[in-house]
């Protein structure tokens, strides 16, 4: 079902939240923010895979894309969730997420990384080529890894 990614995004976003809760014994705004960062990231990531590998998914009887096809509505949703993934990731800079914080250097790094994610999503939106879906998938993996490292190093330094 096209709902598979949405349903899977919920347990897929738990690890960061659970890590925070295990370390602090508190389900606070920090844990919720980490959950939302991971939750919104999953849509462009998995839908880009579904886009690029749509023939294989169709042969297996899976409908990965939200509309069931590679169309403007699907690519617009990918772009929408990419923007939200970035926006949620910069919220800690504004000091409203408790102990989860970002310095000016951290937020600038995430904005730059986020620009790559959004640009990759926009490229897919413009032309719908599998090549751009593959680039977005790779960009999404790099984005998530580097924002996690940004939060880690920003806290250390």
Task: Please tell me what each predicted stretch does.
Residues 1-22:
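Intramembrane alpha-helical segments
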Residues 4, 45, 140:
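Residue-level signal for inorganic ion chemistry
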Residues 14-15, 37-46, 112-120:
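Alpha-helical transmembrane segments and their membrane-interface exit regions
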Residues 15-38, 88-105, 151-157:
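Helix-coil boundary and interhelical linker segments in multi-pass alpha-helical membrane proteins
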Residues 12, 34-37, 74-81, 85, ...:
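Hydrophobic alpha-helical transmembrane segments of polytopic
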Residues 1, 80-138:
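Transmembrane helix-loop-helix
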Residues 134-155:
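Final/C-terminal transmembrane alpha-helix of multipass membrane proteins
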Residues 40-96:
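Solvent-exposed interhelical
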